[in-house]
């Protein structure tokens, strides 16, 4: 069956062997093992003017050879090569004489096929690391002996296959292998993402020097392609577009306006009650200036009281469903997103009804982007990507509409930076094109809702590990079984750096009793947050180092924050009951307004890709003896720098953003009633996602 799948996919894509034409002559095939970054590989290859096509991992070798592909790239994936459900592939892909680059899981597959072994190590690597490379290897030609790369894996190569040599290392972990004579190369890291500083050079070396690609493939005018697709799909029907006022939905609407007659486009802005301060008014004004008439609907009440249908339980595989709690009583991030997505569609249907439009003659248009679909594991984007979180515009109901062919997503193959370029080409004003993204569910996913603390049986042991890490210079003098675990998970270089940091600074690190969404090893994680506090002024470079190190040692931690103010003496072990109520939302709305106002006035808004401001149910600085209840909440500032929103880094104060700008935000937010402490998110993506939910 796998052979049939691979064959039919290739034939349907337009390769015609009967008349002797090889549609993919000189192109590269990307075999998709279910990576979160599969589409980024595709984009990076095309940026280098080489045609690329994505096909299932099980595509047979003979089909690749017959179609004339010049080289093969195998993506990463969430599986283990030894897992019973590991995806099937044709091992002959390595022996048909085509150059192969195996990335992450792809490297482990290659090593296993040729007799090497792969093991799950005690160390996870999720984040940015320095690796040593052999720059005499063709893949790494022109690079330094040490390179900064993104690693995200738990399995590691143990025994290297015969005929292969190690060409890159991350401490004692194999980060690259090569068999130069067979033109087979493996990278445990991700050269396709921006966090790998010279990733583009590595891909260029593979495509041009190793595979001999010619670089004649230039991207066609995608604007015309989008317009052609819209006209073809819609015909004389009408299109309802739900406008948030963000870049994506605005560019989508501008494209629809360009492709269709004005009376065919119905632009609706739904105020869901989770907008930023004065957001709806400014959206309406900005779009009117573009000549787009917008119908604004205040639907806050419908959203607060919205429900959806859910499976009886995660384990229940039957079609039985249950009705969810109302949104204002829901704490689960997944359920919140599903309710919001479904309520959006219900209101859209009501609008269609009020306007006496026939539902079968109306399409729903969305500004959905490629990363949204990849993170939701939608089949449109990737056959196998592991679910990280449901995007509000990719719920079950919307998937059903998509199956019926009633959803138009002209930007589904675009990444955020490409949408901005397209927006400029369409003549949209710069302030609209360059504004920070704001998620469709709005502030609803920036409130960490909780009724009780998140404390599992691993809480005390993880706290003990964090204590050892934060006081490493003293801990090494007192032997402890957990100290050996810390040492086993770190390189000598890491340990030296830890010694240096903890000798100079008085730090304490501990778990916070909440959980947030992250992405670790191409899989979704829903894990603890680690808080760090200190009596010293923050040394941001050291804090960023700790934020990279801690999730590697503690796989149940996917986020690390610095807590402003005096050292936290008694970390909270309970939470302030928090739901999406009007009071909670107005607190967050004000905090978000203050932080973004200061960022805008500083002139640094353009240097930061996005800055979610998050409200958490944490009340610090209470005397446990007085048994004071938890009634305040704390705010997190999450700066994020990225080119594609698939990976990214926090802005380091004193580097990408002035320290005084951050401190001004802290001062102003602290004035808001009911705020306990302010925290700064130090986490890269991975292991933490851009948003906390």
Swiss-Prot record:
Residues 27-216 form the Glutamine amidotransferase type-1 domain. Disulfide bonds: none annotated. It is an enzyme of class 6 (ligase). XMP binds at residues 337, 522, 610, 685, 691. One of its GO terms (molecular function) is ATP binding. Its EC number is 6.3.5.2. It comes from the Eukaryota. Residues 217-435 form the GMPS ATP-PPase domain. It catalyses: XMP + L-glutamine + ATP + H2O = GMP + L-glutamate + AMP + diphosphate + 2 H(+). PROSITE patterns: GATASE_TYPE_1, GMPS_ATP_PPASE. Keywords: Acetylation, ATP-binding, Chromosomal rearrangement, Cytoplasm, Glutamine amidotransferase, GMP biosynthesis, Ligase, Nucleotide-binding, Phosphoprotein, Proto-oncogene, Purine biosynthesis. Homodimer. It is linked to A chromosomal aberration involving GMPS is found in acute myeloid leukemias. Translocation t(3,11)(q25,q23) with KMT2A/MLL1. This is GMP synthase [glutamine-hydrolyzing].
């Amino acid at each position: 069956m796998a052979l049939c799948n691979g064959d039919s996919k290739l034939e349907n894509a337009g390769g015609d062997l009967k008349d002797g034409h090889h549609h993919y002559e000189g192109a590269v095939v990307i075999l998709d093992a279910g990576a979160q970054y599969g589409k980024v590989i595709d984009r990076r290859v095309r940026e280098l003017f080489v045609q690329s096509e994505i096909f299932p991992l099980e595509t047979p070798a003979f089909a690749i050879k017959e179609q004339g592909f010049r080289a093969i790239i195998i993506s990463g994936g969430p599986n283990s090569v030894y897992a019973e459900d590991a995806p099937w592939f044709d091992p002959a892909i390595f022996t048909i004489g085509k150059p192969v680059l195996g990335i992450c899981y792809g490297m482990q597959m290659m090593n296993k096929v040729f007799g090497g072994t792969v093991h799950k190590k005690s160390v996870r690597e999720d984040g940015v690391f320095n690796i040593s490379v052999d720059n005499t290897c063709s893949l790494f030609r022109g690079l330094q002996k040490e390179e900064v790369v993104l690693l995200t894996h738990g399995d590691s190569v143990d025994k290297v296959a015969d005929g292969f040599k190690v060409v890159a290392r991350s401490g004692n972990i194999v980060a690259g292998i090569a068999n130069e004579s067979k033109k087979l190369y493996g990278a445990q890291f991700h050269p396709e993402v921006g966090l790998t500083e010279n990733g583009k050079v590595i891909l260029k070396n593979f495509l041009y020097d190793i595979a001999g690609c010619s670089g004649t493939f230039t991207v066609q005018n995608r604007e015309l392609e989008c317009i052609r697709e819209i006209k073809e799909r819609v015909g004389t029907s009408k299109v309802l577009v739900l406008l948030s006022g963000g870049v994506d939905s605005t560019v989508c609407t501008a494209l629809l306006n360009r492709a269709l007659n004005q009376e065919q486009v119905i632009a609706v802005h739904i105020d869901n009650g989770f907008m930023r301060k004065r957001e709806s008014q400014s959206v309406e004004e900005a779009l009117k200036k573009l000549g787009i008439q917008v119908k604004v609907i205040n639907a806050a009440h419908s959203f607060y009281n919205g429900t959806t249908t859910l499976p009886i339980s995660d384990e229940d595989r039957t079609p039985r469903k249950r009705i969810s709690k109302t949104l204002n009583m829901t704490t689960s991030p997944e359920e919140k997103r599903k309710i919001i997505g479904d309520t959006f569609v219900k209101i859209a249907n009501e609008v269609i009804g009020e306007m006496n439009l026939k539902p079968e003659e109306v399409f729903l248009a969305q500004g959905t982007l490629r990363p949204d679909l990849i993170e939701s594991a939608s089949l449109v984007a990737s056959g196998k990507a592991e679910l990280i979180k449901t995007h509000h515009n990719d719920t079950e109901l919307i998937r059903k509409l998509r199956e019926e062919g009633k959803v138009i997503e002209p930007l589904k193959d675009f990444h955020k930076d490409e949408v901005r370029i397209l927006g400029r080409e369409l003549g949209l004003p710069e302030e609209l094109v360059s504004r920070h993204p704001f998620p469709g569910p709005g502030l609803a996913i920036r409130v960490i809702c909780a009724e009780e603390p998140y404390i599992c049986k691993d809480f005390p042991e993880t706290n003990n590990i964090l204590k050892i890490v934060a006081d490493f210079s003293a801990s090494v003098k007192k032997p402890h079984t957990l100290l050996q675990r810390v040492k086993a998970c770190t390189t000598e270089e890491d340990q030296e750096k830890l010694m240096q940091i903890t000798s100079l600074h008085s730090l304490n690190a501990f778990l916070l009793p909440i959980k947030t969404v992250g992405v670790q090893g191409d899989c979704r994680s829903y894990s603890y947050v680690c808080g760090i506090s200190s009596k010293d002024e923050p040394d941001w470079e050291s804090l960023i180092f700790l934020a990279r190190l801690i999730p590697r040692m503690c796989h149940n931690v996917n986020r690390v924050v610095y807590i402003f103010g005096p050292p936290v003496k008694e970390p909270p072990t309970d939470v302030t009951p928090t739901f999406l109520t009007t009071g909670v939302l107005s607190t967050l709305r004000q905090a978000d307004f203050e932080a973004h106002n200061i960022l805008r006035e500083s002139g640094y808004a353009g240097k930061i890709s996005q800055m979610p401001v998050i409200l958490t149910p944490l009340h610090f600085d209470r005397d446990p003896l007085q048994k004071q209840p938890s009634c305040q909440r704390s705010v997190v500032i999450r700066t994020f720098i990225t080119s594609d929103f698939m990976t990214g880094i926090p802005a380091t104060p004193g580097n990408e953003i002035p320290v005084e700008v951050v401190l001004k935000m802290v001062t102003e937010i602290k004035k808001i009633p009911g705020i306990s402490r302010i925290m700064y998110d130090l986490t890269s993506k991975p292991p933490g996602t851009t948003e906390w939910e």
